[in-house]
Amino acid sequence: MRHTVIFASAFATLVTASAFAADLPGKGITVQPIQSTISEETFQTLLVSRALEKLGYTVNKPSEVDYNVGYTSIASGDATFTAVNWQPLHDDMYAAAGGDNKFYREGVFVSGAAQGYLIDKKTAEQYNITNIAQLKDPKIAKIFDTNGDGKADMMGCSPGWGCEAVINHQNKAFDLQKTVEVSHGNYAAMMADTITRFKEGKPVLYYTWTPYWVSDVMKPGKDVVWLQVPFSSLPGEQKNIDTKLPNGANYGFPVNTMHIVANKAWAEKNPAAAKLFAIMKLPLADINAQNAMMHAGKSSEADVQGHVDGWINAHQQQFDGWVKEALAAQK
């Protein structure tokens, strides 16, 4: 008799679970996430994927492509969403791929993302360098010369990223072309060289952003300092943005927010997923902490999945709340 009760109870649980699965809005629908080739973006992308799975969606592994390709893929419906839409940094790419006519973007996923130019603190203090405009002086520029041509060598970013257009625009706007050579290439490889130079006690000049592990290795304020710019100057869709802060400081880039962007037609047919995209929030500090773990060697696919598990376990109530609110939007 006891076995019969256990079996009946297990069967009832199974039936309830199956019925619940059948009621889930994502049943039978496959989702294709997309991100850039920056592996540190996987954590926040997978967090969204996990929440979608709780809504019943089948979620593929994220595709890694250049941002431009990512936006056009989402606009055409070849991909479903990205969790790394930087605003306003990606505004030109977003607009070029169709803007609000093609994309669904509601809510703010991550707040307070900063970016800009930095130099090592030792050189900054030795030569009293606080502003990138000081690099117009050939004597100052030569301090950062790494290849013997007399110009400062600035580490830029990977071709096709939003920062590439801004850096090139500002190099011209601030009249630095004669004294500063910007290198754009594989960001991770260039950064490895920059960190090696820094550890050797040599001057460094580079672009970076937060959240990212670089600022955990070369800490702003302790090891390196942010450089200000002479005035606000941004290209394209960002051209009217004043980057000056309330305290008068100007680091050349506005503080960015990150958003989950999805194909608009898909979002309209999937209100539960659309609601989820609008309400999910991830603290910048949590991304920094996870990125630092990756840089310390915990960067395999299994490691990153483990980091996602850990975050959800530590924020289970919040995570379940997102899923519950998203499910309610379907009704």
From Swiss-Prot:
Induction statement: Induced in response to increased extracellular osmolarity, this is the third gene of the proU operon (proV-proW-proX). Osmoregulation requires curved DNA downstream of the transcription start site in proV, which is repressed when bound by H-NS. H-NS may act indirectly to influence the local topology of the promoter.
One of the record's GO molecular function terms: transmembrane transporter activity
Cellular component, GO, one term: periplasmic space
Keywords of the record: Amino-acid transport, Disulfide bond, Periplasm, Signal, Transport
Signal peptide (from-to): 1-21
GO process terms (BP): amino acid transport
Main localization category: periplasm
Subcellular location field: Periplasm
Binding site for substrate: W86, H90, W161, G162, C163
Cystines in this chain: C157-C163
Keyword Signal part of the UniProt annotation: yes
UniProt cross-references to Pfam families, sorted A to Z: OpuAC
Subunit structure: The complex is composed of two ATP-binding proteins (ProV), two transmembrane proteins (ProW) and a solute-binding protein (ProX).
Function (record text): Part of the ProU ABC transporter complex involved in glycine betaine and proline betaine uptake. Binds glycine betaine and proline betaine with high affinity.
Protein name stated in the entry: Glycine betaine/proline betaine-binding periplasmic protein
Organism, scientific name: Salmonella typhimurium (strain LT2 / SGSC1412 / ATCC 700720)
Lineage of producing organism: Bacteria, Pseudomonadati, Pseudomonadota, Gammaproteobacteria, Enterobacterales
Gene: proX
